[in-house]
Amino acid sequence: MTNDNLYRYLFEGVSVRGELVQLGNTYQQIIASKEYPAPVQKLLGELLVATSLLTATLKFEGSITVQLQGDGPVRLAVINGDHEQKMRGVARWEGEVPTDGTIHDVIGKGHLVITITPTKGDRYQGVVGLEGDTLAESLEGYFANSEQLKTRIILRTGEFEGNAKAAGMLLQILPDGQGQEGDFEHLEQLTETVKDEELFGLDAQDVLYRLYHQEEVKLFDPQSVEFHCGCSRERSASAICSIERIEVEKIIADEGKVSLHCDYCGTSYDFDSIDVAALHENAAKNDRDQVH
């Protein structure tokens, strides 16, 4: 199992749907951007898996952002993904982060914020308190409150064969499945038996067979998941041009350059006085060309 993929599946004769996501490279790139403490890496991995699972529920082109905000050691942890399963994320923390604490120990008094932004249409934002002791329990509460659909979410992170891995599953009763709670609970019990090493090391087909070999499962083609930051030197140059030139020149006079750092991938873009002069010269030329 080497690729980062999201899988969707259905159960024949039962109005329950499932998702399985298995991530390696995507997770590794996100946690490599900073020297995150182990508990923060774990939290980002769970958020990453959760965002991938939630993004798969979008029925339109757009993006979804899942973030945790609080007054604890980790003030912010956020993952952004889109309908193409392109992911990026970052976290901010202060001091020592508890290794074996609950989500309340890590985030403190806080909220789970889910923002859905369609390419066309209005943005939607849902804010819920942190329920239970884990991120998964808070997400299950979100679905119970916002969609009134019984949902079970499993989020796992860890190391497998020397590499950081993140994986998870979502099980949800379909809108027309009300009254089939018994079937859902049966499948829920089966899903909860999944082991970390199975999620991290087996192909999706093998994971599903081990869990549901007595059920009829329809597995759909996978969708690849990847890290995608979106930053570039060109975007950084545009940002510099939007700042008063005298302020930029003062920074260069003090530090020899102006630097823009991308929190998502860790890349720094440096501009010296010659670069800045060229940027403004090109901007002025473009303005003249538009006038004529």
Swiss-Prot record:
Disulphide bond pairs: C229-C231, C262-C265
GO biological process: protein refolding
Alphabetized SUPFAM superfamilies for the sequence: Hsp33 domain, HSP33 redox switch-like
Gene Ontology MF term list: protein folding chaperone; unfolded protein binding
Pfam families: HSP33
Keyword vocabulary terms for this entry: Chaperone, Cytoplasm, Disulfide bond, Redox-active center, Zinc
InterPro entries given in the database record: Heat_shock_Hsp33, Heat_shock_Hsp33_C, Heat_shock_Hsp33_N, Hsp33_helix_hairpin_bin_dom_sf
Any single Gene Ontology cellular-component annotation: cytoplasm
Localization (cell): Cytoplasm
Post-translational modification: Under oxidizing conditions two disulfide bonds are formed involving the reactive cysteines. Under reducing conditions zinc is bound to the reactive cysteines and the protein is inactive.
Primary localization: cytoplasm
Keyword Cell membrane among record annotations: no
Functional note: Redox regulated molecular chaperone. Protects both thermally unfolding and oxidatively damaged proteins from irreversible aggregation. Plays an important role in the bacterial defense system toward oxidative stress.
HAMAP family given in the database record: HslO (MF_00117)
Family: Belongs to the HSP33 family.
The name this protein goes by in its record: 33 kDa chaperonin
UniProt gene name: hslO
